């Protein structure tokens, strides 16, 4: 585990974004942990979050030309990541996002910000079913000269859907692009094992991983 990954997990726990207990997911599964990126809801938290996304980009080495934040949650994520890349990695890159509904007046269209062209890195919080990413892929495919370079998310739950694959593995298979994350469940487990206060949650998370993991 990289230092920035350990720092991110601690940061997520401190902000109440990553919690341990008993949570019912939309899928109906009872999960021993829950991740709610909507709680990165202050200026300081968003700035720190951008630095973690930027660190994951630097670590991945994925080449790309533009950052894309899917509406709505991806918009501030792409913005703060672009700021962090410029301020901490000396990479001043364009970024853009989509509207849920296209405007008929003013600047018009469904895309806002830099032109969506070249290799596109999609920024989001998590991939649950993959539906949102599939919609984004259609948007990118509709733009001349644009193609997806990859997807970056905060947490990879490493959890299968209804079949044998996770939603992330299905996206990688169907579109031939990498999906990278700041951290995965593997690193969360490693963090729990090393933390005296949180170690009590390790057996439940390991059992969940054994049942639903990929």
UniProtKB/Swiss-Prot annotation:
<comment type="subunit">
    <text>Homodimer.</text>
</comment>
<dbReference type="InterPro" id="IPR004467">
    <property type="entry name" value="Or_phspho_trans_dom"/>
</dbReference>
<feature type="binding site" description="in other chain">
    <location>
        <begin position="124"/>
        <end position="132"/>
    </location>
    <ligand>
        <name>5-phospho-alpha-D-ribose 1-diphosphate</name>
    </ligand>
</feature>
<keyword id="KW-0460">Magnesium</keyword>
<feature type="binding site" description="in other chain">
    <location>
        <position position="100"/>
    </location>
    <ligand>
        <name>5-phospho-alpha-D-ribose 1-diphosphate</name>
    </ligand>
</feature>
<keyword id="KW-0808">Transferase</keyword>
<dbReference type="GO" id="GO:0006207">
    <property type="term" value="P:'de novo' pyrimidine nucleobase biosynthetic process"/>
</dbReference>
<dbReference type="InterPro" id="IPR029057">
    <property type="entry name" value="PRTase-like"/>
</dbReference>
<dbReference type="InterPro" id="IPR000836">
    <property type="entry name" value="PRibTrfase_dom"/>
</dbReference>
<comment type="similarity">
    <text>Belongs to the purine/pyrimidine phosphoribosyltransferase family. PyrE subfamily.</text>
</comment>
<feature type="binding site">
    <location>
        <position position="128"/>
    </location>
    <ligand>
        <name>orotate</name>
    </ligand>
</feature>
<dbReference type="GO" id="GO:0044205">
    <property type="term" value="P:'de novo' UMP biosynthetic process"/>
</dbReference>
<feature type="binding site">
    <location>
        <position position="103"/>
    </location>
    <ligand>
        <name>5-phospho-alpha-D-ribose 1-diphosphate</name>
    </ligand>
</feature>
<keyword id="KW-0328">Glycosyltransferase</keyword>
<dbReference type="GO" id="GO:0046132">
    <property type="term" value="P:pyrimidine ribonucleoside biosynthetic process"/>
</dbReference>
<dbReference type="GO" id="GO:0004588">
    <property type="term" value="F:orotate phosphoribosyltransferase activity"/>
</dbReference>
<dbReference type="InterPro" id="IPR023031">
    <property type="entry name" value="OPRT"/>
</dbReference>
<feature type="binding site">
    <location>
        <position position="99"/>
    </location>
    <ligand>
        <name>5-phospho-alpha-D-ribose 1-diphosphate</name>
    </ligand>
</feature>
<protein>
    <recommendedName>
        <fullName>Orotate phosphoribosyltransferase</fullName>
        <ecNumber>2.4.2.10</ecNumber>
    </recommendedName>
</protein>
<dbReference type="GO" id="GO:0000287">
    <property type="term" value="F:magnesium ion binding"/>
</dbReference>
<comment type="function">
    <text>Catalyzes the transfer of a ribosyl phosphate group from 5-phosphoribose 1-diphosphate to orotate, leading to the formation of orotidine monophosphate (OMP).</text>
</comment>
<feature type="binding site">
    <location>
        <position position="157"/>
    </location>
    <ligand>
        <name>orotate</name>
    </ligand>
</feature>
<feature type="binding site" description="in other chain">
    <location>
        <begin position="72"/>
        <end position="73"/>
    </location>
    <ligand>
        <name>5-phospho-alpha-D-ribose 1-diphosphate</name>
    </ligand>
</feature>
<feature type="binding site">
    <location>
        <begin position="34"/>
        <end position="35"/>
    </location>
    <ligand>
        <name>orotate</name>
    </ligand>
</feature>
<keyword id="KW-0665">Pyrimidine biosynthesis</keyword>
<dbReference type="GO" id="GO:0005737">
    <property type="term" value="C:cytoplasm"/>
</dbReference>
<comment type="pathway">
    <text>Pyrimidine metabolism; UMP biosynthesis via de novo pathway; UMP from orotate: step 1/2.</text>
</comment>
<feature type="binding site">
    <location>
        <position position="105"/>
    </location>
    <ligand>
        <name>5-phospho-alpha-D-ribose 1-diphosphate</name>
    </ligand>
</feature>
<feature type="binding site" description="in other chain">
    <location>
        <position position="26"/>
    </location>
    <ligand>
        <name>5-phospho-alpha-D-ribose 1-diphosphate</name>
    </ligand>
</feature>
<dbReference type="Pfam" id="PF00156">
    <property type="entry name" value="Pribosyltran"/>
</dbReference>
